[in-house]
């Protein structure tokens, strides 16, 4: 669905509409912090970190450069815009909700959302201070490269609503809206896709052209399915291997020896996921491997599985922005014509602040 939104220019239209009020501000680093918050909001509707980052590179990046922010500072804010993998359409959210056997809207609204707002605000302040400090410290960089960034297609003004439709459907037809109607993520995506398809037909008045454009949707679906199936099979085989070797029993015994409480276990598991995500360059692969094992581990310890998995999910998400090999870091660095290592220097402090805030937030809120 995100790929189709990109194809018809709906995501670009939404970004342009939300960015427009910020043009009037002439305070570069205040705009930078606000752009980060905007990016965080859009990440709920665009569940792929790289897709969102590339969209922001053609919309937000030139604006920040013209205001006087350095290329590496602007790129750091854009790369970390998908800071935490949350929302009803996020793969990790669907995995954890299924493992816990709770509805996706309940997990999203009841656990993710409050923590998401807290981390977003604190990290925006960290970006404001860190990027301003580094820009003053570092030598000025050439900003002419923004001219080489190709423009993304932009749809009509009404198209800005389409990226929001799945989220509206999922939350609207739940206990937070109309509880009498049940709607899962798949149905919400397909219904929103049908509405967007009808709008495209009205816009172009050419059935063949519109139907041909649907290949973008199904190609994106196929790519995601192949990726997910590979992760599921690989994760289950790996997890079963750990159980067969007795490593899970050894881990439970070690954790019992440490006498960890819920906060301690959340920190340990979240830190472990952060490290795995940094090494692999993926936040989803480690989760598919270890999340199915968590209920057994926490049940033996008598602790809450939800907060543990929430900490693991956030740790895995944040690890992406501390890894120079993650697709989003490589992609943004390539478009901005900077080194991944230089980008990593700019993302590290805000991401570590986000990690600490996430841990403290879980302890305080749950």
Q: Can you annotate each of these PLM segments?
A:
Residues 7-10, 20-25, 64-72, 97-106, ...:
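Juxtamembrane helix-boundary/capping and inter-helix hinge elements in multi-pass membrane proteins
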Residues 13-16, 50-63, 90-101, 251, ...:
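Re-entrant/interfacial helical elements at transmembrane boundaries that shape
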Residues 23-59, 231-235, 256-296, 300-301, ...:
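Hydrophobic alpha-helical transmembrane segments of multi-pass integral membrane proteins
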Residues 1-13, 185-249:
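Core transmembrane alpha-helical segments of multi-pass membrane transporters/permeases
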Residues 109-216, 335, 342-345, 366:
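Long, contiguous bundles of hydrophobic transmembrane helices that form the permeation core
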Residues 28-42, 67-87, 107, 111, ...:
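Alpha-helical transmembrane segments of multi-pass membrane proteins
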């Amino acid at each position: 669905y995100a790929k189709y939104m990109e194809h018809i220019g709906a995501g670009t239209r939404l970004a342009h509409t939300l960015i427009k009020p910020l043009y009037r501000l002439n305070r570069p680093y205040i705009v930078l912090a606000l752009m980060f918050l905007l990016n965080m909001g859009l990440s709920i509707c665009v569940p792929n970190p790289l897709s969102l980052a590339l969209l922001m590179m053609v919309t937000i990046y030139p604006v920040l450069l013209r205001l006087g922010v350095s290329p590496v500072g602007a790129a750091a804010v854009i790369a970390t815009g998908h800071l935490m993998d949350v929302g009803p359409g996020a793969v990790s959210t669907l995995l954890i909700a299924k493992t816990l056997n709770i509805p996706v809207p309940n997990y999203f609204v009841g656990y993710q959302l409050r923590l998401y707002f807290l981390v977003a605000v604190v990290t925006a302040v960290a970006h404001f201070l860190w990027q301003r400090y580094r820009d003053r410290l570092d030598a000025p960089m050439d900003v002419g490269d923004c001219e080489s960034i190709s423009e993304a297609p932009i749809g009509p003004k009404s198209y800005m609503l389409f990226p929001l439709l799945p989220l509206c459907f999922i939350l609207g037809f739940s206990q937070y809206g109309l509880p009498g109607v049940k709607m899962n993520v798949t149905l919400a995506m397909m219904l929103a896709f049908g509405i967007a398809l009808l709008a495209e037909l009205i816009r172009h008045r050419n059935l063949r052209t519109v139907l041909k454009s649907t290949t973008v949707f199904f190609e994106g679906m196929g790519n995601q399915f192949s990726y997910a199936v590979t992760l599921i099979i690989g994760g289950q085989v790996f997890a079963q291997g750990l159980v067969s070797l007795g490593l899970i029993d050894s881990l439970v015994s070690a954790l019992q020896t440490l006498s960890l409480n819920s906060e301690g276990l959340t920190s340990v598991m979240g830190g472990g996921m952060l490290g795995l995500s940094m090494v692999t360059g993926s936040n989803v692969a480690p989760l598919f491997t270890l999340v199915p094992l968590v209920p057994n581990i926490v049940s033996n310890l008598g602790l809450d599985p939800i907060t543990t998995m929430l900490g693991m999910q956030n740790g895995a998400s944040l690890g992406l922005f501390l890894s120079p090999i993650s697709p989003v870091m490589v992609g943004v660095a390539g478009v901005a014509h900077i080194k991944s290592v230089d980008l990593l220097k700019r993302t590290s402090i805000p991401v570590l602040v986000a990690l600490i805030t996430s841990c403290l937030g879980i302890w305080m809120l749950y």
